[in-house]
A protein has these predicted regions:
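Alpha-helix termini
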Residues: 14, 18, 66-69, 73
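Aromatic-residue detector
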Residues: 15, 60, 116-119
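Metzincin-family zinc-dependent endopeptidase catalytic domain
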Residues: 1-58, 83-85
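Poly-acidic low-complexity segments
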Residues: 9-11, 48, 64, 167-171
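Conserved catalytic/binding loops enriched for acidic/polar residues
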Residues: 70-171
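Flexible, active-site-adjacent loop/turn segments at secondary-structure boundaries
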Residues: 2, 6, 63, 73-74
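Catalytic Zn2+-binding segment of zinc metalloproteases
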Residues: 55-70
């Protein structure tokens, strides 16, 4: 039996910061003083994504900075908000942050927590999970290959799929 405990604190300044990002994108300076609901939705979507990210750490998941190149396949990436322009040329924040776990997250949890019955070669079964994950087109780029490592010799952010704060498949 395994007991997992994680303690994560997400301060209100994070929500405020994302609210201000939305304000900068939307410039909602209407004469009547109204504020678009999209600003709060944007900020709350980010805090939900961040909460899932931090919970992932409590489960043992590391950052995966290639997930943004794989269609937002993991909450363990550092996502830049995905903002598009609507038909009128106005910023649309409705898809800024994804909801739920990504495919990479599900595969990583399967790898780390799958119980194999007696008689099954667990090492071979885990290797097959990894092979199937990569065969599905998912990638993994760790911290050391995205931003370097203070404790190892590293080329730093040299991997084309491992940029922090990006979004999309074009490295």
């Amino acid at each position: 039996q395994e007991i997992i405990k994680g303690h994560v604190t997400l301060g209100s300044l994070r929500v405020r910061q994302d609210y201000l990002l939305a304000e900068g994108l939307l410039a909602p300076y209407a004469e009547d003083g109204s504020v678009p609901e999209a600003m709060l939705d944007f900020a709350l979507a980010r805090i939900r994504q961040l909460a899932a990210h931090e919970l992932g750490h409590t489960l043992g998941l590391e950052h995966n900075f290639a997930a943004s190149a794989d269609g937002r396949a993991s909450v363990m990436d550092y996502p830049h908000p995905y903002v598009i322009l609507d038909a009128a040329g106005e910023p649309d924040l409705s898809q800024a942050y994804t909801t739920g776990l990504g495919e990479w997250d599900k595969r990583a949890i399967l790898l780390g927590y799958q119980h194999f019955p007696d008689g099954v070669d667990a090492a071979a079964a885990r290797e097959q999970i990894v092979r199937d994950t990569y065969a599905a087109g998912l990638h993994y780029v760790a911290d050391v290959h995205s931003r370097g490592d203070a404790f190892a010799v590293s080329a730093g952010p040299a991997h084309p799929l491992g940029s922090l704060w990006d979004n999309g498949s074009d490295p």
